[in-house]
Curated annotation (Swiss-Prot):
This is Uncharacterized protein L609. Residues 88-131 have a biased composition (Low complexity). Residues 56-76 have a biased composition (Polar residues). Residues 132-141 have a biased composition (Acidic residues). Residues 39-146 are annotated as: Disordered.
């Protein structure tokens, strides 16, 4: 049975949900097989780890020495310094020099460049190399004299770096500014008279900006003929007076001699209508009957007839 399951191992990845519903026993067997296999692996791992622990404890127990003193921990001191000096002078505080300047920090200049070498550090390093100074040596009066010399060197450094003090910097800046000031006589001034701005005119200029025709608007609607017209024929005829339309206050573009088809709802007869304009802006229709039957196509429109007087140029 296990051999058959191993052969069908790849079958899981190729089957759909519908196939799982058809053959549920196969998946139960498959799950039991993998569960038992995982339990075997867990048991084998646990036995190996237990054997390793037992072997390690046996080896440790063999290497333990037999003659171990019991009171070792009592004889170990807790706070033991590693480097204990042999001879420590008792009167160390008496050898400190008395005449030490108190205000040493105030005499140090503030604006010292970083790349300038420090003479006092060099003296300390040379002193330690020449005399082979060690912590075990006694304090003497010679060392106190050297300390005094160090303080005197630091005080002398003020004269070396006096150019970098704050007072000198401020004086130099003031002198440079005074030297760089140019005379007013060197320039020629022109006086311009400023006129007041007309706000009403500015507002009109901004509000009267009319939006331009965008390319996506490719046709316009004529409410008189109830038809859409293309943008290519805009302002084609000069005879049309745009501001004197009798029907509407807004002008919509259309072609002057365009043929439109109109259907009479009573008789069902078709007419071809021409809309003709006058130079004054008025227009009239020319109606001609059409014998053929037109087909409905996208773009063709049908208009109902209004039975009124069609006398042109009333």
């Amino acid at each position: 049975m296990s051999i058959d399951l191993e052969k069908n191992h790849n079958r899981i990845y190729s089957m759909n949900i519908n196939s799982m519903n058809r053959d549920p026993e196969f998946y139960l067997k498959k799950a039991k097989y993998f569960y038992s296999k995982s339990q075997e692996n867990v048991d084998s791992d646990s036995t190996d780890s237990d054997n390793e622990k037992n072997n390690s404890t046996k080896n440790v127990s063999r290497n333990i020495p037999k003659n171990i003193p019991k009171s070792i921990s009592k004889n170990i001191p807790k706070n033991v310094p590693r480097n204990i000096p042999k001879s420590i002078p008792k009167n160390v505080s008496k050898n400190i020099p008395k005449n030490v300047p108190k205000n040493v920090s105030k005499n140090i200049p503030k604006n010292i460049p970083k790349n300038v070498p420090n003479k006092s550090r060099n003296k300390y390093s040379n002193y330690s190399e020449d005399s082979n100074y060690s912590e075990d040596s006694d304090y003497s009066s010679d060392e106190s004299n050297s300390i005094n010399t160090v303080y005197s060197d630091e005080v002398d450094s003020e004269s070396i770096y006096s150019d970098y003090s704050d007072d000198n910097d401020q004086n130099n800046v003031q002198n440079n500014v005074q030297n760089n000031v140019e005379n007013e006589d060197d320039y020629d001034y022109e006086y311009v008279k400023m006129e007041p701005v007309d706000l009403a005119q500015l507002i009109e200029e901004h509000t009267d900006l009319r939006s331009k025709i965008k390319p996506k608007y490719t046709r316009f609607y004529d409410p008189v003929t109830r038809h859409y017209y293309s943008i290519d024929k805009l302002f084609e005829h000069e005879d049309v007076l745009l501001n004197k339309r009798p029907t509407t206050g807004v002008w919509y573009p259309e072609i002057q001699n365009q043929n439109n088809i109109m259907k009479d709802p009573k008789t069902g007869q078709l007419f071809r209508v021409k809309k003709i304009y006058n130079p004054k802006g008025k227009y009239h229709y020319e109606i001609n009957s059409v014998k053929r039957q037109t087909k409905r196509k996208p773009g063709t429109t049908y208009y109902t007839v209004t039975y009124e007087d069609l006398d042109p140029l009333d």
